[in-house]
Amino acid sequence: MTATIIDGKETAREKREQLAKEVEELKKQGVTPGLAVILIGDDPASHSYVRGKKKAAETMGMNFKLDQFDSSLTEAELLSIIDQYNQDPEFHGILVQLPLPDHISEKAVIERISPDKDVDGFHPLNVGKMLLGEDTFLPCTPHGIVELLKKTNIDLSGKEVVVVGRSNIVGKPVGQLLLNENATVTYCHSRTENITEHTKKADILVVAVGRANFISADQIKEGAVVIDVGVNRLENGKLCGDVEFEGAKEKASFITPVPGGVGPMTITMLAHNTVKSAKRTLS
């Protein structure tokens, strides 16, 4: 068996075309969806991610504003900037690019962003609503993963899902979203013993640990759906995921590539949340 590739680029392109139409409709009603991004420091990956967000937002006709600061910005100064955007009706989404310098509390920053403009879906209020299955801003990468899974037309209900990784940004929320779809979810992490025992049972395997080629083909059940969230750069400069792709694609029924799988969906779902926030201002 050779797996069908789940094309994140194509799914993202379709979704972005739909969002661009929604932005046009909002503009006719006098609302231009606005996204404010705050970037601190000189982390190359963060700068790359922000460029991607800017390009996507502007391509869809949204208003994008970037505030860039060096690492000397204080926590108090950052919180004050967030307060200004919380009050500014021109902006429907606020995103502070992570990671932050050590002297700034990530928790304080996430909790300072208004839940109504928390397009990353990280605020405790929105996390709580997600837990309850209520309508809210969903975290972008997990939401993108669920959208990709739905594109395969696989019924998620009753499926054995194994999530490898338990970060607040991907692992925990993607498991919760799949639980909300009536899947049976198991989490594995650095303290899990005999991880292969779990992964080999998975109808759907989601791997998000940030370690190159962490999962090999012999840890995957024949015919499983494999979602690889990792983006790792090898010494030769090539990008790879957390799953050993060449072997895994001979075992899986569906698999996401790296790059071109989950990544394009993350920015797309950020745009989705920003448009959703803009729509709320009309109701």
UniProtKB/Swiss-Prot annotation:
BP-aspect Gene Ontology terms: L-histidine biosynthetic process; methionine biosynthetic process; purine nucleotide biosynthetic process; tetrahydrofolate interconversion
Catalytic activity: (6R)-5,10-methylene-5,6,7,8-tetrahydrofolate + NADP(+) = (6R)-5,10-methenyltetrahydrofolate + NADPH; (6R)-5,10-methenyltetrahydrofolate + H2O = (6R)-10-formyltetrahydrofolate + H(+)
Keyword Hydrolase: yes
Gene giving rise to this polypeptide: folD
Family listed: Belongs to the tetrahydrofolate dehydrogenase/cyclohydrolase family.
Subunit annotation: Homodimer. Interacts with BrxC.
Protein's organism: Bacillus subtilis (strain 168)
Protein purpose: Catalyzes the oxidation of 5,10-methylenetetrahydrofolate to 5,10-methenyltetrahydrofolate and then the hydrolysis of 5,10-methenyltetrahydrofolate to 10-formyltetrahydrofolate.
Protein name listed in UniProt: Bifunctional protein FolD
Pfam families from the UniProt entry: THF_DHG_CYH, THF_DHG_CYH_C
Residue ranges that the Swiss-Prot or TrEMBL entry lists as coiled coil: none
EC number: 1.5.1.5, 3.5.4.9
Cellular component aspect of the GO annotation: cytosol
InterPro entries assigned: Aminoacid_DH-like_N_sf (IPR046346), NAD(P)-bd_dom_sf (IPR036291), THF_DH/CycHdrlase (IPR000672), THF_DH/CycHdrlase_cat_dom (IPR020630), THF_DH/CycHdrlase_CS (IPR020867), THF_DH/CycHdrlase_NAD-bd_dom (IPR020631)
Residues annotated to bind NADP(+): 165-167, 190, 231
